[in-house]
A protein has these predicted regions:
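Charge-rich, low-complexity N-terminal segments
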Residues: 1-46
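Non-catalytic, beta-rich accessory domains that mediate macromolecular interactions or localization
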Residues: 12-14, 18-22, 33, 93, ...
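Cysteine/selenocysteine-centered motifs that mediate thiol-based redox chemistry or coordinate metal-sulfur cofactors
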Residues: 16, 122-167
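Residues that form generic nucleotide/phosphate-binding pockets
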Residues: 25, 37-44, 119, 133, ...
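Electropositive phosphate-/nucleotide-binding environments in soluble metabolic enzymes
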Residues: 28, 32, 80, 107-114, ...
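Structured beta-strand/loop patches that form or line metal/cofactor-binding pockets in enzymes
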Residues: 40-95, 101-103
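Generic structural motif
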Residues: 89-91, 106, 163-165
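A hydrophobic, small-residue-rich beta->alpha segment in the mid-to-C-terminal subdomain
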Residues: 94-136
C-alpha cells in the first residue's frame, strides 16, 4: 500500500486554500471584467446547465472592526452582500459539483457568474483553462489596481522628522 500524494494547489481536488484564492479574486473583480474573462475562457462554449440551490439574493452583513486595529471588536455597520449557490447538472453523474459566490454589493448577475465559474473550476475538464484564462488575468488586473492605489497614496505621504536641540 502506497501513501497517496497530496493534491497540488492547481488541481481541482485540492482543498480550501486554492478555492479560497480563486473565490477571493472573483469577489473582488468587477462584473464586466468577470463576464468578459469568463466568455474568453469558455472559448465560445455555452455555459453549462445548472440548478439553483440558492438563487442570487441580496442581504446585509454586519461589518466588524477592531479598536486600534488589534483591540476589542465592535460593530462598525452593515454592508450589502449578494450570494448565490448552484449545482451543475451532469448527465455522467460523476458527483455533485456545487458553485458558490458571495460579494459586496447588489449585483445578482455578478454572483451568478462567479458561482458558475467556481463550479467549473472544480471540474477537471475546465480547471486548468479557467485558472490560466480567467483567474490569472483577473488576479493580475487586481494586483495592478492595488499597486496604482498604493502609488497614488504614497505620492501624498508626508515624512515628519525631529531635530535634536542643543547639538
Amino acid at each position: 500500500m502506497s501513501a497517496a500524494s497530496p493534491p497540488s494547489a492547481d488541481s481541482p481536488a485540492s482543498t480550501h486554500p486554492a478555492r479560497r484564492a480563486w473565490m477571493a479574486v472573483m469577489a473582488r473583480s468587477a462584473r464586466a471584467d468577470l463576464e468578459a474573462a469568463l466568455n474568453r475562457a469558455m472559448e465560445g462554449l455555452p455555459l453549462p446547465a445548472f440548478d439553483w440551490l440558492r438563487p442570487p439574493e441580496i442581504g446585509l452583513a454586519m461589518v466588524r472592526g477592531r479598536i486600534g486595529g488589534t483591540g476589542d471588536a465592535f460593530n462598525l455597520g452593515e454592508a450589502t452582500v449578494t450570494r448565490a449557490t448552484l449545482r451543475l447538472r451532469d448527465e455522467r453523474d460523476e458527483g455533485t459539483i456545487v458553485g458558490v459566490a458571495c460579494h459586496l454589493g447588489r449585483d445578482r448577475r455578478r454572483a451568478e457568474l462567479a458561482a458558475i465559474a467556481d463550479a467549473l473550476l472544480q471540474t477537471p475538464q475546465h480547471h486548468a483553462r479557467l485558472q490560466a484564462q480567467l483567474i490569472a488575468p483577473l488576479a493580475s488586473q487586481l494586483a495592478a489596481q492595488h499597486a496604482q492605489r498604493q502609488q497614488d497614496a504614497a505620492s501624498t505621504r508626508v515624512e515628519f522628522f525631529t531635530m535634536v536641540r542643543g547639538d
